[in-house]
From Swiss-Prot:
It comes from Rattus norvegicus (Rat). PANTHER family: POTASSIUM-TRANSPORTING ATPASE ALPHA CHAIN 1, SODIUM/POTASSIUM-TRANSPORTING ATPASE SUBUNIT ALPHA. InterPro entries: ATPase_P-typ_cation-transptr_C, ATPase_P-typ_cation-transptr_N, ATPase_P-typ_cyto_dom_N, ATPase_P-typ_H/K-transp_N, ATPase_P-typ_P_site, ATPase_P-typ_TM_dom_sf, ATPase_P-typ_transduc_dom_A_sf, Cation_transp_ATPase_P-type. The modification Phosphotyrosine is found at residues 6, 9. The gene is Atp4a. This is Potassium-transporting ATPase alpha chain 1. It is found in: Apical cell membrane. Its main location: membrane. Residues 118-140, 318-329, 802-811, 876-927, 981-995 are lumenal. The modification Phosphoserine is found at residues 26, 461, 599, 838, 952.
Amino acid sequence: MGKENYELYSVELGTGPGGDMAAKMSKKKAGGGGGKKKEKLENMKKEMEMNDHQLSVSELEQKYQTSATKGLKASLAAELLLRDGPNALRPPRGTPEYVKFARQLAGGLQCLMWVAAAICLIAFAIQASEGDLTTDDNLYLALALIAVVVVTGCFGYYQEFKSTNIIASFKNLVPQQATVIRDGDKFQINADQLVVGDLVEMKGGDRVPADIRILSAQGCKVDNSSLTGESEPQTRSPECTHESPLETRNIAFFSTMCLEGTAQGLVVSTGDRTIIGRIASLASGVENEKTPIAIEIEHFVDIIAGLAILFGATFFVVAMCIGYTFLRAMVFFMAIVVAYVPEGLLATVTVCLSLTAKRLASKNCVVKNLEAVETLGSTSVICSDKTGTLTQNRMTVSHLWFDNHIHTADTTEDQSGQTFDQSSETWRALCRVLTLCNRAAFKSGQDAVPVPKRIVIGDASETALLKFSELTLGNAMGYRDRFPKVCEIPFNSTNKFQLSIHTLEDPRDPRHLLVMKGAPERVLERCSSILIKGQELPLDEQWREAFQTAYLSLGGLGERVLGFCQLYLNEKDYPPGYTFDVEAMNFPSSGLCFAGLVSMIDPPRATVPDAVLKCRTAGIRVIMVTGDHPITAKAIAASVGIISEGSETVEDIAARLRMPVDQVNKKDARACVINGMQLKDMDPSELVEALRTHPEMVFARTSPQQKLVIVESCQRLGAIVAVTGDGVNDSPALKKADIGVAMGIAGSDAAKNAADMILLDDNFASIVTGVEQGRLIFDNLKKSIAYTLTKNIPELTPYLIYITVSVPLPLGCITILFIELCTDIFPSVSLAYEKAESDIMHLRPRNPRRDRLVNEPLAAYSYFQIGAIQSFAGFADYFTAMAQEGWFPLLCVGLRPQWEDHHLQDLQDSYGQEWTFGQRLYQQYTCYTVFFISIEMCQIADVLIRKTRRLSAFQQGFFRNRILVIAIVFQVCIGCFLCYCPGMPNIFNFMPIRFQWWLVPMPFGLLIFVYDEIRKLGVRCCPGSWWDQELYY
């Protein structure tokens, strides 16, 4: 097979001259070469320089060999499908499963253990070839080491496999079916079978199945919020209205939603060649950043591996110098490595992260990458999208102006009730107008669904008005039926109003009712009177001024404002059955009566303000990054607390002081709103300076490329950046961030694929839960690692004493593996369940460069203080066991050569008793067991002191963490099983030991506990002192 050539292009959707959206392509990476690569580049450029929106219908037909009435020929469609491939976004090339598994088996510590296993196997093979089979220790040790690496590797791979496949359930981006016309026949096919030149039809409620050039449309509006971040519906029509394909109205984009109306058009781009496909390419061109916890563990593994090799090599040289054979010295080197490397550490870390991920999953946070759990805890900046993340992603009626008063509507997510007076006749008239002058309709069969959650066919504004009407009137659709519609003029950009005429519900009243809604200033200019408390009053200058004040007040809140008016048509001029002609306009469209204003906004989620406040308390900066209008963005930012009360922008200060903006000192403004045009003109250093100067930032009208720039600028300031979002336009920034958080319900597939974490309930507040859990797991991992490292010293010192003082070996390699992977792993993991010592959400985020997972105080305290005490306990028990069997300590010194002599069968102890080699081996295994039990008894004290780093263990409580209590009991039970289970001496070299040998290490365990309580007392009493700096880890 030849090497596959591939090229990757990123797309920048930026703002061009005059505020136009422009597309810019940059080549990111190329593989292969020669003429094919150049040709492919030229083809890509041609696709980027799309001019399909400017071509006439006949030119389109010629270009794509299709018909605007009959569509493609079926035979040609099959050829094009073969040439271009399916109409689907190609997923990024994944890592093969065998490579993922191999990585789990070949990390830094794993490589050391493979080498150690190989040395053991070689030693056993040489022993076997020489006929020396007195012990199979080397074979058992090799098999144990291999089993450790394979089992931990399988566990790690399983966790990664679960994480990477969790996204498989989210496949909502590409529509399942599309209506296509081929050879003049209309039928439905899978959307991925569409090709360029296909003639397709779509209606309200459908997703756009490809990039489509509109040929005909009736009231068609699309929702581009997942692409641009704008909540407002966008009209689609056959006319070319802009040079840029991104701004013109006659192109509908792949994966956007058709809200209402119908449209027919030709497919001009499919799959990866669509606009959304190019943004996905931009995301795939962004390299994943290493997570802080991954960097920490990598750093720690490097240190441990380096020290293990250093100690092993040192002892290897010493062993060679005192007369060991090369093979025995290598086995000794391997023993040092096994003793020094915490084999269970990676499994412990993985289990701790998995437990936290599971805990988060129960709170609707799904973690795709386990390491992202801790990263969220160290987050110092959250760059949040607005639409759908901070807001509900649905337009909602927020304010009404009638009877010369602004009334506030209920914008909560359940919209349980309205707070304004509904008894006014003006209110009834306004409600009638907004209900009748509305083309939106509920999908059938939703009577049992709460009104705010019902699916509506219609654009966002009309959907908001319909739901508002349903909540206030009751049955809005039934209300419409009582006022049959006679004629209608749909909203268009020229008139900027919508008008409809209805017959009245009272059969005795023969009049018609004309109702109109639209841009407030356009509606007002068609009115001559205004409805105040049910009475029509002349629309004089006083009322026009009142209207203007209300209009500016609502517009200043960043809300979309519509005006409403009505007119009863005289039955003499317009009798029942009169034929209204919308073309000739044979009815009045001026002299109307103004009923009021209604403003709408995509309101913030109820839980967001509290979540933002918690972030601020936790020292986390929340920055809004949206594609929406700056005024709307600023209003939402202020309502959720991103811009705090009393904070002003430069523009606000200038307005307050009545001075030019350029004369205001920017450092006086706490808040800042930057739009895409301004951002484009800023160089990186200016952006960094703006982020440093203004604590409260809002970015509006941003492109995907600009979101990337913002994330990179925050990272340049040393921040750990989390990015939240749900749209396709968020995916590049989600991938670039230290942690990307996507929305599970409203989120696009591209966003979910790029993210590290998915919020199943789309609730920004869930991020705060994630931050708290992330901080807690870092604290608990620190405690777990401190506990794990402590026993390395009592495991290492027996070999140090063995080779320097020449005593019989106190501890065997297999025994060490049982400590690492059997008895100690359960208490180590149980620390993941430990509750926080204090309110960790009142602390600043940790600095990844300064607050390391394993720092000098932790290593020094674990190794040289607690570890040293455990070593003394082990040797006290070892020498006690030897003395009680007749081997006094002084006799043990220098005894090693005779002790290990296979041929010496009459070695005398301190009482003159003679010991055969088999008896000595039995005693040596007894010493292994004694030293093992000593370490385990001291580790019980160690795990109790690790419950807290600053508070007293009595303050934290001994029994609050029930898992830890169970783990300690389990640890003791395993120790008893290994000591007293029949057959253990022959398999794993564990021997039954006397009861008093269990008691020898207990005073040392008590010393560890008391010593640590004194340390914690000093840390609490002397904050900032030498004691605190050196002994608080």
